């Protein structure tokens, strides 16, 4: 009997502790929700004061620290891609500014030091006849040319397919390739791309991407009447003064008029 009483007391204590913890958790969740709701209302008022609005579906993302990353240019990968597109008999020309141009009887491919690429080559397998076939053909081309990206996504408009792919699990807002299938049996490639694995420098530089600050700064530069739909933290690929490719932390903010 004595043990039964002790057991009941212990169970009661455990229930009381659990109820306390549950109540404390609920209170904190309510506090966080109230704080987020208050911040959302304040931001909407401030953006409205700038002459713009936030879409009803807009949600402010969390602040994040992103390290500055570097990329080594791979001339070997550039040449391999060009050789598949143009054939083994292509000629290679390199200019002083780092531009490398490949040319054959089938077309041309030009890579620039900042990661930009453009070219024209024959369409493998013939011209697709609808958007579904265009996506399928583009994915096949990117894969065969060594230009497929891990976690890539695709958008199609007519016979133009755009591939985007993240780096280090973060979007790179200007890293994309567009492949357009032409009626004459050729394909036109354009965009900005990178190969290899990014890495940090010894200094480990980076940026605190503060969403509210970036949003208000952006809103102050908008034309009156624009609606902000979303914002995403990520990178922008660019070349530094030493001609090294870098991934610079930045926000992409989408409105109803521009990206």
Residue ranges and their predicted role:
Residues 184-259:
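Extracytoplasmic/luminal low-complexity segments enriched in Pro/Gly and acidic/polar residues
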Residues 71, 90-92, 100, 156-161, ...:
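Hydrophobic transmembrane signal anchors and adjacent membrane-proximal interface regions, especially
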Residues 13, 177, 251:
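Residue-level detector of short, conserved catalytic/binding motifs and their immediate flanks
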Residues 133-181, 187:
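Glycine- and small hydrophobic-enriched segments that form the cores of compact globular domains
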Residues 99-123, 163-200, 254-259:
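Amphipathic N-proximal alpha-helical interface segments
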Residues 1-149, 165-167:
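Preferential activation on post-signal-peptide N-terminal prodomains/segments
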Residues 92-95, 146-162, 224-238:
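Short glycine-rich, low-complexity/disordered patches
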């Amino acid at each position: 009997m004595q043990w039964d009483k002790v057991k009941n007391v212990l169970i009661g204590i455990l229930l009381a502790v659990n109820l306390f913890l549950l109540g404390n958790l609920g209170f904190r969740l309510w506090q966080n929700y109230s704080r987020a709701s208050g911040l959302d209302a304040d931001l909407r008022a401030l953006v409205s004061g700038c002459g713009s609005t936030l879409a009803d579906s807009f949600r402010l993302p969390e602040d994040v620290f992103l390290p500055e990353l570097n990329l080594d240019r791979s001339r070997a990968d550039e040449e391999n891609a060009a050789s598949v597109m143009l054939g083994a008999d292509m000629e290679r020309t390199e200019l002083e500014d780092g531009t490398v141009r490949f040319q054959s009887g089938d077309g041309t491919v030009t890579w620039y030091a900042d990661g930009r690429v453009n070219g024209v080559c024959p369409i493998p397998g013939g011209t697709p006849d609808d958007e579904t076939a265009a996506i399928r053909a583009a994915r096949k081309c990117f894969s065969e040319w060594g230009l497929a990206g891990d976690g890539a996504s695709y958008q199609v408009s007519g016979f133009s397919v755009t591939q985007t792919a993240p780096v280090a699990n973060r979007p790179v807002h200007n890293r994309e390739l567009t492949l357009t299938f032409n009626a004459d049996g050729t394909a036109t490639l354009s965009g900005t791309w990178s190969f290899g694995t990014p890495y940090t420098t010894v200094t480990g530089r980076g940026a605190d991407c503060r969403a509210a600050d970036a949003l208000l700064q952006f809103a102050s530069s908008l034309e009156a009447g624009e609606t902000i739909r979303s914002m995403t933290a990520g990178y922008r690929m660019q070349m530094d003064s030493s001609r090294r490719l870098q991934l610079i932390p930045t926000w992409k903010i989408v409105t109803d008029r521009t990206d």
